[in-house]
Structures are given as C-alpha cells and as structure tokens.
Amino acid sequence: MLTNNQLLKHSRIKKKKQSYNFYTKPQIKGLCIKVFTRTPKKPNSALRKIAKIKLKNKKEILAYIPGEGHALQDHNFVLIKKGRVQDLPGIKYKVIRGVLDTIGVLNRKSSRSKYGTKKII
C-alpha cells in the first residue's frame, strides 16, 4: 500500500496487457518472412520448425509450425493463433495448418482437426 506522499511523487504503475499483437482477436493473418529451425530447452533434443511472420498490424513475431513436414516458404500467407510451445522459450504463437497457404499434415489419422487434414475415405 502506498502512502499519500509516495503517490504525490510517483503515480501508480499500470499493468501491461498480455499480448498487443492480437488484442481481442482469436486469430490473425500474417505474411511469412523466413522459415528456420531452432533447438529446444535442455532435456529435449530436436529441430523445431519456426517461422518469422509479419502480421497485418506491421509487427513481427516468431511462430511454431506444428506437425510433421510443411511446405511453408517465404511470402506465404498464414493464419496465427495464440499458444506457447513448452520447450521453446520466446515462442508464444502457432501456425494454423490447412488454412490459406499452409497445407495440412499428410496421411494423418488421429487428431486431424489440429493439423488441418481432411478425412480419408
């Protein structure tokens, strides 16, 4: 609790909002600038696929590309959702597969809706 003298000298610090990139939108469209790989934190080892994306509001973010294999290239349009990857620090967004220029995971049988795959008949 602040005293009156402390409030006179310094105003209260306002809390920052969590994500300025999305505001209240569930997804946002962006343009892929660069696709590269990154290694995860200590106990895990792999090459996770990452894309640098320029959003519609002119901000640049890093997003994780889920699933096995992708055909994402520079200058492709992608749809982004919120959601962090636990073993990649600083990556707070994911690419939605099967929408715009991103194709779904091929030959996927289970959890198809997460990876944008149509039902195989």
From Swiss-Prot:
Please describe the quaternary structure of this protein: Part of the 30S ribosomal subunit.
**Where's it mainly located?**
plastid
The record's subcellular location field reads: Plastid, Apicoplast
Which Gene3D superfamilies did the record assign? Nucleic acid-binding proteins (2.40.50.140)
User: Which one of the record's GO molecular function terms can you name?
Assistant: rRNA binding
The name this protein carries in UniProt is: Small ribosomal subunit protein uS12c
Instruction: Enumerate the UniProt keywords alphabetically.
Output: Apicoplast, Plastid, Ribonucleoprotein, Ribosomal protein, RNA-binding, rRNA-binding, tRNA-binding
Q: Name one GO biological process term.
A: translation
The record's annotation in SUPFAM superfamilies points to:
Nucleic acid-binding proteins (SSF50249)
Q: InterPro entries this protein is in? A: NA-bd_OB-fold, Ribosomal_uS12, Ribosomal_uS12_bac
Q: Cite a single Pfam family from the UniProt record.
A: Ribosom_S12_S23
Q: Name one GO cellular component term.
A: apicoplast
Gene responsible for this protein: rps12
Q: Which protein family is named in the record?
A: Belongs to the universal ribosomal protein uS12 family.
- What is this protein's function? With S4 and S5 plays an important role in translational accuracy. Located at the interface of the 30S and 50S subunits.
